[in-house]
Amino acid sequence: MNKKSLSTLEFYKITDQLVSYACCDGAKKILRNLKPMTDITDINLRLNETNDALSRIFQKGTVDFSQTKDIRASVARLKVGSSLNISELLNISAILSCAKHVKDYYEHREDSISGMLENLATVDALNSQIKKCIISEDEISDDASSNLRSIRRSKSIANDRIHSELNKLLNSPTYRTYLQDYVITTRQGRYCLPVKAEYKSAFPGMIHDQSSTGSTLFIEPAAVVKLNNDIRELELKEAAEIEVILADLSAKAGEHTEELLCDYEILVELDCIFAKAQLARHMHASRPVMNTSGIINIKKGRHPLIESHTVVPIDIYLGTDFKLLIITGPNTGGKTVSLKTVGLLTLMAQSGLFIPALDHSDIAVFKNIYADIGDEQSIEQSLSTFSSHMTNTVKILKEADENCLVLFDEIGAGTDPTEGAALAIAILNDLKMRGVTTMATTHYSEIKLYALSTEGVENASCEFDVESLRPTYRLLIGIPGKSNAFAISKKLGLPDYILSDASERLNAEDVHFEDIVSDLEHARISLEKEQAEVESYKAEIASLKEKLQAKNERLDERTDNIIRKANEQAAAILKDAKDFADETIKAMNKHGMTVAELEKHRTAVREKMNKNQAKLKVEPAKVKAHKAHDISEFKTGMHVKVLTMNVSGTVSAIHPAKKQVTVQVGALSTKIDIKNLEILSDYKEPKEAPSKAAGGSGKIKMSKSAGISTEINLLGCTVDEAVARLDKYLDDAYIARIPQVRIVHGKGTGALRNGVTAYLRGVPYIKSFRLGEIGEGDAGVTIVDFK
């Protein structure tokens, strides 16, 4: 990749940012030398790594690689059998600890970096041994070996003895007058006392040092010379034992040189990958879609070196209908920034970095990128001359091909406008004919006309607000830039007569061209305003639609709650009424009743039902849409569903005039409008024989037994249908004093049998029930015995 272009497009400023996110020195060095790649497979692999690292950061946060020390020199020494010092062994422990932390922190998942994580070798035994033996760079643990512990214990005892002897001298009345100070000190590793110089002959011992004034001598008392010698001997033994411990640890580390080296390389690579992910997160960048077709389609691209609160995103595309894009517009209007944005984002993408643009932005892979940009807008370089521009251009024309991207800033500038425009058109046309993807900025109208009249070339402009005299930095592809010199001059107060004189001096063709461009600009602005209004209306409609939908959902929820509560209340009332009716039937069967007594009980039941009905204070629930039935469709014995109560029953009477039918629900009988009924099946209950009173006895005799079967067949019914039919059948059978009945429900999935069993448990007048035995129908029937 062209190094000059990397510098011109400020790629190294991106790598400087990238380096700041790396933790270890090895990763920083690699990232500082990062260069764009030209193989799309390698690029996509690096982008996959960045993407997967970013995903892991979002899920579990980042991890610290700062303990990844460069152990390559230490490993090389281990390979030849050398012993490592304390610092080197601590670095190896740090590498192993970091490997374990990274491996444990990021759980297993299949992605582009999972293989690296799996290949990390933690070598726990070695790491534990190093940590056990070494406390810090200055201290070896007593637990490193039993011999070291013994030596240090002896050394401690010797220290205590020597301090005891010295303290005796300090407290001795004889020697106190000889001492300059009452402290114990060390000189040359030996314990001494500070003695006044004039008493040196009176204080037996060895002189090791004196004060700067010479008034104090540091004398090792004769009484502790042997003890000092003992301590010195123990110190030498301690040092020798430490060397043995370090040699032993080094030997153990030497058994894992390949794992240690592999861990270091993997951790450095992971640090690089996670640094790229951190940069992407900081820039709010996204993954580009790479291609080898020369297509660039950047959506809302932002120059990464411009402050996020000031940068204006641009949409820019080329490589499909055209490969040469001419950008025109005022100075400081964003033309050069547009060039640099395309060039820099391409370099970033080819380096495996995410780009500050919207998702699914397309970036082409180029073999080389050439940038001839007059760096008048860079504080680091001075204005280029025409000669230097032309030198760059000659080099570009020699080297560029269809796999390259060429960026020209103010092509043909710095010389006579007529000659400069002609040269620029010739250069651009040559690159177009060779299929080179090219972007160029210019002020020349001739180049705008060339773009308008040449296939495969497109105009673009940087928008300028004449009212505020400020560029908007928006890039508009398909519209050539308009020279705003006259409008700006008038806005700034230049007299009209000068403007008029200048207009007359313009070439007629130039005036016509500028008028066309001006008309296009006005049409574009008008269209954008209309489009903005349409988008505003669409957003308002969407908002209203969302609010209406939310309101309807709340209303539906409220309605459902009302219906649910009403159904619960109705079910409770029905249960209350049925329980009362059951008790009445039980009493009637037990004692027998006169017709008058029966009528009295019937009146009591009706009064209780009326009271229960009064409790229902909710509005009738809205009935869900269903097929409307005509009164002629209803037959006695037909099974129906009462939609307002969500219960099933049997038609016992029909009232055509009122379009109502009487529905029997268990022991409860009530009139219902047919609009609130749904026919469930054409099933008809067997006709019941009319009850007759026994001859003058005044007792009710149940002669229904002649019309009540000892068996009910529920095959083909749903659970709800079966329970409704079973409820009425059992009432009739109990009243008819049939001692035992047989319920046929089949085996099937068991749902119907379970529903029947659950219902039977709540019937008060049932003595017992069981599944059929062999010969009775087995598990396909249930036998019920009444009380």
Swiss-Prot record:
SUPFAM superfamilies: DNA repair protein MutS, domain III (SSF48334), P-loop containing nucleoside triphosphate hydrolases (SSF52540), SMR domain-like (SSF160443). PROSITE patterns: SMR (PS50828). CDD domains: ABC_MutS2 (cd03280). ATP binds at residues 329-336. Its EC number is 3.1.-.-, 3.6.4.-. Pfam families: MSSS (PF20297), MutS_V (PF00488), Smr (PF01713). GO terms for biological process: mismatch repair; negative regulation of DNA recombination; rescue of stalled ribosome. Residues 712-787 form the Smr domain. It is an enzyme of class 3 (hydrolase). Keywords: ATP-binding, DNA-binding, Endonuclease, Hydrolase, Nuclease, Nucleotide-binding, RNA-binding, rRNA-binding. InterPro entries: DNA_mismatch_repair_MutS_C, DNA_mismatch_repair_MutS_core, DNA_mismatch_repair_MutS_sf, MSSS, MutS, MutS2, P-loop_NTPase, Smr_dom. GO terms for molecular function: ATP binding; ATP hydrolysis activity; ATP-dependent DNA damage sensor activity; endonuclease activity; mismatched DNA binding; ribosomal large subunit binding; rRNA binding. Homodimer. Binds to stalled ribosomes, contacting rRNA. Belongs to the DNA mismatch repair MutS family. MutS2 subfamily. Endonuclease that is involved in the suppression of homologous recombination and thus may have a key role in the control of bacterial genetic diversity. This is Endonuclease MutS2. It comes from Lachnospira eligens (strain ATCC 27750 / DSM 3376 / VPI C15-48 / C15-B4) (Eubacterium eligens). The lineage of its organism: Bacteria, Bacillati, Bacillota, Clostridia, Lachnospirales.
